[in-house]
Swiss-Prot record:
Optimum pH is 5.0. The keyword Phosphoprotein does not apply. One of its GO terms (biological process) is polysaccharide catabolic process. Optimum temperature is 50 degrees Celsius. This is Glucoamylase. Keywords: Carbohydrate metabolism, Glycosidase, Hydrolase, Polysaccharide degradation. It comes from the Bacteria. It comes from Bacillus licheniformis. GO terms for molecular function: glucan 1,4-alpha-glucosidase activity. The lineage of its organism: Bacteria, Bacillati, Bacillota, Bacilli, Bacillales. On the 2D-gel the determined pI of this protein is: 5.0, its MW is: 185 kDa.
Amino acid sequence: SSNKLTTSWG
């Protein structure tokens, strides 16, 4: 989930 959240920032 954390990785997906990072993508959101990108």
